[in-house]
């Protein structure tokens, strides 16, 4: 089920504080966050946010098309190594 429209988008308070500081200054360092559940807001456009994927922080540059999505959608958590090769096909 989706979130109720009357509640508005969710974003962690500590992330909003970091975004306000980064957007007011001219610092281009990525903002580190573990908050994959936060919704991308219009204030995030043009910033680079390093989203944790369980192992490392993946840098995500926020564009206009990403507004409304969650940060976790852009930091993939699973690595696909490929299916096992078929031994019969190799012969």
From Swiss-Prot:
<dbReference type="GO" id="GO:0006412">
    <property type="term" value="P:translation"/>
</dbReference>
<dbReference type="GO" id="GO:0005737">
    <property type="term" value="C:cytoplasm"/>
</dbReference>
<protein>
    <recommendedName>
        <fullName>Small ribosomal subunit protein uS19</fullName>
    </recommendedName>
</protein>
<comment type="similarity">
    <text>Belongs to the universal ribosomal protein uS19 family.</text>
</comment>
<dbReference type="GO" id="GO:0015935">
    <property type="term" value="C:small ribosomal subunit"/>
</dbReference>
<dbReference type="GO" id="GO:0019843">
    <property type="term" value="F:rRNA binding"/>
</dbReference>
<dbReference type="GO" id="GO:0000028">
    <property type="term" value="P:ribosomal small subunit assembly"/>
</dbReference>
<dbReference type="InterPro" id="IPR002222">
    <property type="entry name" value="Ribosomal_uS19"/>
</dbReference>
<keyword id="KW-0687">Ribonucleoprotein</keyword>
<dbReference type="InterPro" id="IPR020934">
    <property type="entry name" value="Ribosomal_uS19_CS"/>
</dbReference>
<comment type="function">
    <text>Protein S19 forms a complex with S13 that binds strongly to the 16S ribosomal RNA.</text>
</comment>
<dbReference type="GO" id="GO:0003735">
    <property type="term" value="F:structural constituent of ribosome"/>
</dbReference>
<keyword id="KW-0694">RNA-binding</keyword>
<dbReference type="Pfam" id="PF00203">
    <property type="entry name" value="Ribosomal_S19"/>
</dbReference>
<dbReference type="InterPro" id="IPR005732">
    <property type="entry name" value="Ribosomal_uS19_bac-type"/>
</dbReference>
<keyword id="KW-0689">Ribosomal protein</keyword>
<keyword id="KW-0699">rRNA-binding</keyword>
<dbReference type="InterPro" id="IPR023575">
    <property type="entry name" value="Ribosomal_uS19_SF"/>
</dbReference>
């Amino acid at each position: 089920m989706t979130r109720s429209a009357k509640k508005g988008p969710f974003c962690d308070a500590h992330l909003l504080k970091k975004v306000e500081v980064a957007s007011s200054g001219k610092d281009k360092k990525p903002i580190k966050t573990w908050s994959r559940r936060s919704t991308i807001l219009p204030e995030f456009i043009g910033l680079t946010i390093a989203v944790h994927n369980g192992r490392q922080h993946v840098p995500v540059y926020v564009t206009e098309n990403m507004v409304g999505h969650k940060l976790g959608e852009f930091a993939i958590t699973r690595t696909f190594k490929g299916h096992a090769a078929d031994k019969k096909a190799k012969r």
